[in-house]
Amino acid sequence: MAKKGTRIVVTLECTECRSAPASEKRSPGVSRYTTEKNRRNTSDRLELKKFCPQLNKMTIHKEIK
């Protein structure tokens, strides 16, 4: 029988989309990405710089539950 995997799927959400007014956005909503992380190597929350299509620029995306 196989062991439980160490890799889990996490969701990354743009931190600037939540606080930006609607006039600055190209479209309503929040930018989200899904990715995998290794639970053993990175036990803390993931934080990556990714492209946000709503704001049309690179922003910090943080892991959400």
UniProtKB/Swiss-Prot annotation:
The keyword Signal does not apply. One of its GO terms (cellular component) is cytoplasm. The keyword Translocase does not apply. One of its GO terms (biological process) is translation. GO terms for molecular function: structural constituent of ribosome. Residues 20-42 are annotated as: Disordered. This is Large ribosomal subunit protein bL33. Belongs to the bacterial ribosomal protein bL33 family. Keywords: Ribonucleoprotein, Ribosomal protein. InterPro entries: Ribosomal_bL33, Ribosomal_bL33_CS, Ribosomal_bL33_sf, Ribosomal_zn-bd. It holds the Pfam family Ribosomal_L33.
